C-alpha cells in the first residue's frame, strides 16, 4: 500500500511538473547573494495568522554551489510567544538560487524540538524547491537541527514547555501555521512573489501535523503528504514511558499504583 501511495504521489507531481513546463511563464526565478538584503530583520506580528508577540529574523547567509547542491540562501528566525513565559518557535527557510516557484514545509518527528530543515545536500533544493520548517515551539528534541536560535525561560527544565498552554498549542497545530506564514513573507521578499505551489510533507509526528493542517489550514497548501501519522497525541506523549516499560524485565514493571505514587 505504501509503495502504491508513493507511486500515485509521484505520478501526480510528475503530471503537475509536465503541465508547468509547458507554461512559458513558469520559468525558474534566479536570485543572487545581493538579494539577501531584502529579507529584513523582522516580520510584523500582524502577518502571522495565529497570535504571536513578534518575529525576529537573523542575518541571512548565502551557501555557494557544490558538486552536489546548487547555491541557496538561508534565512532563520524566531517567532516569539504571546505568553512572556512561553517558548519561541525557531525556524529555517532554504531558498534556492534558481527557484521553481514551489515550496515545501517539512514536518517534525517524535516530540520535535529541533528545526526540521537542514542545510546540505537535499534533493528538493536540487529541484528548485524552497524548503522550510521549525522546531515546533520548544528546544532540545531528537535529531538535532543546528545551533538553537532562541530558547524558553531562563532556568526552565527541558520538559517544562509541556506545562505551558501556548507551547502545547504550538506543538498541536499553531506552529505549522505560524511557520508557514513567516516563510511566505520571506519568500515574497526574496523572490518578489509567493509560491505557485506549496506542499506539506511529514511522517509520524509530521504525518499528524499533515492531517492537522489539512483540517485547519487547507487553503495554505496545494498538496499534503501524511505518512504513518500519529493520530493520537496522548499516545505520543506517553511513548517514552511505554517504550521503557516494554524494554524492562518483569521485575522492573511499574504498576499503576507505583505510577500514581510517582506522579503524586
Task: Cite the ranges covered by each PLM segment.
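Catalytic-loop region of hydrolases
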Residues: 21-102, 115-118, 263
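Alpha/beta-hydrolase fold nucleophile elbow
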Residues: 193-204
Amino acid at each position: 500500500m505504501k509503495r502504491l501511495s508513493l507511486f500515485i504521489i509521484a505520478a501526480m507531481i510528475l503530471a503537475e511538473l509536465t503541465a508547468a513546463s509547458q507554461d512559458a511563464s513558469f520559468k525558474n526565478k534566479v536570485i543572487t547573494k545581493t538579494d539577501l538584503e531584502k529579507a529584513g530583520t523582522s516580520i510584523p506580528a500582524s502577518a502571522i495568522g495565529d497570535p504571536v508577540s513578534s518575529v525576529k529574523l537573523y542575518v541571512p547567509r548565502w551557501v555557494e554551489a557544490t558538486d552536489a547542491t546548487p547555491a541557496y540562501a538561508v534565512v532563520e528566525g524566531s517567532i516569539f510567544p504571546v505568553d512572556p513565559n512561553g517558548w519561541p518557535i525557531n525556524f529555517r527557510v532554504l531558498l534556492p538560487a534558481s527557484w521553481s516557484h514551489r515550496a515545501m514545509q517539512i514536518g517534525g518527528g517524535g516530540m520535535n524540538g529541533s528545526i526540521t530543515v537542514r542545510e546540505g545536500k537535499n534533493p528538493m533544493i536540487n529541484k528548485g524547491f524552497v524548503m522550510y520548517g521549525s522546531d515546533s515551539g520548544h528546544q532540545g528534541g531528537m535529531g538535532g537541527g543546528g545551533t538553537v536560535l532562541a530558547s524558553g525561560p531562563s532556568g526552565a527544565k527541558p520538559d517544562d514547555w509541556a506545562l505551558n498552554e501556548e507551547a502545547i498549542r504550538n506543538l498541536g497545530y499553531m506552529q505549522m501555521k505560524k511557520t508557514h506564514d513567516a516563510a511566505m513573507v520571506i519568500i515574497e521578499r526574496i523572490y518578489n512573489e509567493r509560491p505557485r505551489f506549496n506542499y506539506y510533507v511529514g511522517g509520524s509526528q509530521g504525518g499528524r501535523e499533515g492531517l492537522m493542517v489539512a483540517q485547519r489550514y487547507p487553503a495554505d497548501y496545494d498538496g499534503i503528504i501524511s505518512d504513518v501519522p500519529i493520530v493520537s497525541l496522548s499516545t505520543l506523549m506517553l511513548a517514552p514511558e511505554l517504550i521503557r516499560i516494554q524494554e524492562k524485565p518483569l521485575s522492573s514493571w511499574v504498576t499503576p499504583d507505583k505510577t500514581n505514587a510517582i506522579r503524586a
